[in-house]
Amino acid sequence: SSHRRQRQMCIRDSLNILAAMLGIVGISMLIPTLIAYFNSEPNIRGYVLSIVICLSLSIPIWLITRKSRKLTSKDGFALVTFAWLIVAFAGSLPFYLTESIPNFTDAWFESMSGVTTTGATIIGNTQTLPNLLNGIESLPKGILFWRSFLQWIGGMGIILFTIAILPLLGVGGVQLFKAEVPGPVADKIRPRVKETAKVLWLVYIGFTAIQTLLLGLAGMPWFEAVCHSFTTMPTGGFSTQNESIAAYS
């Protein structure tokens, strides 16, 4: 029937967008991989495997479902839900596969806390993670960066992140935006959703860069300045120190 065919098209379009998001998260893992490489960290294989898993899942699905059509509001709500779950799953892979957090449930918790900017952490519990006797400070730099980066992309909302890439996929982002920001506000922004997303991201990146510069000039090591800017800008709260910002007082 035409209704069943329409639903299949919507599922196809949703899978296309989710696959694109998974692929972008996978590509972004190149940054902590390079950090780990230049710091001669022993766990680079875990990052590479994480990238391979994300891209091997996302690229075939994206290619198969490439023909895009118009999404409904119902699809938008479903996408919001699955976007958080998929990005949190992808984000947990470097924690788990580098054995920084050897329990997958704990890795999932840490990742979900990051992308939702909740700020709760499993790290520091020596009973659960006896391999991290010094808590957060036991983590390698690549993982410290990845924790911070997850909060940073979560800070603007996964949906705004999606809106930014939707024009590349030929799909409108209004349904996703309405699912994240319901009511008259979404309707007002509706005609300029693409431009709004661009401006918000530019402001977000700009403030992050300014904060990094100020922290660095104030004496904080540049790597830690970047990580703290990535976590304070979205009000997430992750830190590279057990005592958080108090460690610098």
Identify the residue ranges that each predicted region occupies:
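Single conserved hydrophobic/aromatic residue that forms the stacking wall/gate
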Residues: S1-R7, I11
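P-loop potassium selectivity filter motif centered on the GYG triad
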Residues: A19, S28, A90-G154, L217-S249
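Hydrophobic alpha-helical transmembrane segments of multipass membrane transporters and ion channels
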Residues: G23, I27, F82, I86-A90, ...
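Central hydrophobic cores of alpha-helical transmembrane segments in multi-pass inner-membrane proteins
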Residues: S28-L30, L49-T65, A83-A90
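Short, hydrophobic transmembrane alpha-helix segments
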Residues: P32-R45, I64-R69
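Juxtamembrane interface elements at the cytosolic ends of transmembrane helices
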Residues: L57-R66, I158-V193, I205, W222-S229
